[in-house]
Amino acid sequence: MEDYKAFLDEKMSKVLLSLDNEYKTLRTGRISSNVFDKIFIQYHGQKTPITQVSSIRIPEARLVVIQPWDKTILNKIEQAILNSDLSMNPSSDGSVIRIKVPALTSERRQDIVKHAKKIAEEHKVSTRNIRQDLNNKVKKQEKESEITEDSLKRILDDIQKSIDIYIKRIDTILESKIQEIMEV
């Protein structure tokens, strides 16, 4: 099981990428077009993200302009934004949607921080599940006499040290995101 480090690194890079993608969709003090990544509309019979059917620009710090490529879906996009958990109120002039983004209240910031912590914890659980799977594979090899008991202990220690490093990295990413959310 010499390739356990490569296996662990591959799995953990996917966990960290997933964490990063989830955090991109959280609203922070600065508005980003990524907050619209998880807003979908029905388009040609399929659930489609609004980011794939429109251009999203942020000309000012608190203004978002969404221009659908097909004007017939303007109302669908507007409704999807209203029905989302972003607490935004879009207005349409018939060709583009403008959203004046209000500053986040401290209560809303706390809710977003709570959600960010929940996301981090879910990713830590994924990390621990990866550790458990890897530990089981290594223990199975020891039972089948593919590796010695000393090798087993060394490998399990290495796995635990690597997992600890990845958990610290998740905590660091969380702290950075919390600072970004709380920034006024």
Curated annotation (Swiss-Prot):
Subcellular location: Cytoplasm
GO molecular function: ribosomal large subunit binding
Family: Belongs to the RRF family.
Name of the protein in question: Ribosome-recycling factor
Main subcellular localisation: cytoplasm
CDD domains per the UniProt record, alphabetical: RRF (cd00520)
Keyword Nucleotide-binding found: no
Gene: frr
GO biological process: translational termination
Keywords: Cytoplasm, Protein biosynthesis
